[in-house]
Design a protein with these regions (language model features):
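Enrichment for repetitive, rod-forming helical segments
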Residues: 9, 80, 311-312
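Positively charged n-region of N-terminal signal peptides that target proteins for export
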Residues: 2-4
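Active-site-adjacent loops and short helices of periplasmic peptidoglycan-processing enzymes
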Residues: 22-189, 199-200
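Bacterial N-terminal signal peptides
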Residues: 6-16
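Penicillin-recognizing serine hydrolase domain
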Residues: 24-45, 53, 119, 149-319
């Protein structure tokens, strides 16, 4: 009996020191802000990782699956960068913008576009710039068709690559994250994994494509060049910010997968479910500020988990 009691006591002590990230979050309040040390947030989905130490500095709703909207384009970018790295593709390779693809993804759909023209031949380099800088749905589709002959075949490749890098909760249905009846779903934890792997596996590609301030491509009806600013809400506003992608649907709200580096220390973050573009930007900046101020070591960087919000309307806009 004494031995059994001692064993139970030892298990209890060990359990007390398990990372909080391993514990299930059973709190269900949808209204109270989450506090961890000096940080508090109303965001239903938040995750912040110190990339170098691996410490999860803050986590809330990180395993909840949701539609990522244009953040799915980071997966498309990873696939393309992987093909470039393996020599199966070059930046100079040109793909033609087919009539079917153009009709499906030009600006009349209401989605983001880099303003490709029908039958235009565009380099992989320019398509990647359009994909990331201005969130071009057309760029994603042209890459998919050019690489695999069709969007469906490319999506199979996306899902295979996602599984191979440890994205265990994610499934993609389109190359650009356009609403597809609930097929495309990710988790914040998987998005953090994707960003981490992209930055580690393709540092040159990350540096080349993810922090371009603006992109000029296409001609407006009045003959002027079309110039669009980068959609990243903290690029140029937050010291060290250098990627990755925004997203927006009515289901997921305003979302952002972002990264910044200061003094050799890199943080990766996800926020989702924000009520406006401004709220998304402000939350991202505040979370990053808090993260860089926090001490991040493997010993002290266990996740702090908070309440999750389950109520969202299904939905439809895409940026």
């Amino acid at each position: 009996v004494k031995v059994a009691a001692a064993a139970l006591a030892l298990l209890a002590v060990n359990a007390a020191f398990l990372p909080v990230a391993w514990a299930k979050d059973n709190r269900t309040s949808n209204t109270a802000p989450v506090s961890s040390a000096s940080y508090a947030t109303q965001a239903p989905i938040v995750m912040l990782k110190d990339m170098d130490s691996g410490a999860i500095l803050f986590s809330r709703g990180a395993d909840k699956r949701f539609g990522p909207a244009s953040m799915a384009k980071v997966m498309t970018a990873y696939v393309v960068l992987d093909l470039l790295k393996r020599g199966e593709l070059t930046r100079e390779t040109k793909f033609s913008v087919g009539e079917t693809t153009w009709k499906k993804w030009n600006s009349s759909t209401g989605g983001s576009t880099m303003f490709l023209s029908p039958n235009e031949k565009v380099s992989v380099d320019d398509l990647l710039k359009g994909l990331i800088t201005v969130s071009g749905n057309d760029a994603a589709a042209v890459l998919a068709v050019g690489i695999d002959g069709g969007e469906d075949a490319f999506v199979k490749r996306m899902n295979a690559v996602a599984a191979s890098i440890g994205m265990t909760s994610s499934r993609f249905g389109t190359p650009n994250g356009w609403p597809d009846g609930g097929i495309t779903k990710v988790s914040a934890a998987d998005l953090i994994t994707l960003a981490d792997r992209l930055i580690r596996d393709h540092p040159d590609g990350y540096a080349r494509y993810f922090s371009i301030p603006k992109l000029q491509h296409g001609i407006s009806p009045d003959g002027r060049p079309i110039v669009q600013a980068n959609r990243n809400p903290i690029l140029g506003r937050f010291d060290g910010a250098d990627g990755l992608k925004t997203g927006h649907t009515r289901e997921a709200g305003y979302c952002f997968l972002g990264s910044a580096e200061r003094d050799g220390r890199r943080l990766i973050m996800v926020v989702a479910g924000m009520t406006s573009a401004k709220a998304r930007r402000d939350e991202a900046q505040r979370l990053m500020d808090w993260g860089f101020a926090a001490r991040a070591t493997a010993a002290t960087g266990h996740a702090r988990r908070g309440s999750t919000s389950a109520s969202r309307a299904a939905g439809a806009t895409h940026r």
